Amino acid sequence: MRRNRGLKKIKTSVEDLKVIHSGKKIRLMFQDEAGFGRINRPKYCWCEKRIRPSVPCHHIREYRYAYGAVEPLTGDGYFLVMPYCNTVCMNIFLKKLSERFPDDIILLCCDGAAWHKSGGLELPENIILFHIPPYTPEMNPIEQIWKEIRKRGFRNEVLKK
C-alpha cells in the first residue's frame, strides 16, 4: 500500500509540472559521478599455459571525475569531466546541463551524496532535483554506464600524466 501512495504522489507531481510548464518537454534524467584515476586494478586476461602475463601497475592517486546525466527513454545524455566531487563542480555541471537543454524541464534524479544536498547548491530554473533512497545504486541506470566504461575502457591500462 505504501508503495502505491508514493507512485501516486510522483504521478500527481508530474501532472502538476505539465500544467505549470505547459508547452515544455519534461525530461526524466538520472545523474551520478564516477571517479577515474591513475591507480589501476589488474584484471584477468588470456595467455598461453604456464605463462604468467605481465600487467604494468602503479599506485599514483590522481583522479578525474566524470559527471553524467542520462535520459533512459531517449538515450540523450550529458557528460562533463571535472577535477573534484564537490558542490562547486556540481553547480558547474548543473549550469552546463541546463544550458544543454534550455527549453526543457529536467527532473534530475540523484543519489544522496553530500554535494547533492548541500546548502550551496544552485539549481537552475529548469532543473528539479529529487533523490533516490540511500544505498540503492540499482535504481540509477547511469551506474551501468560507469560499469561498462570501467570494464571496456580502463582494464589493464596504465594512464600517463
Regions found by a protein language model. Give the residues of each.
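Short functional hotspots at interaction and active-site rims
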Residues: 1-161
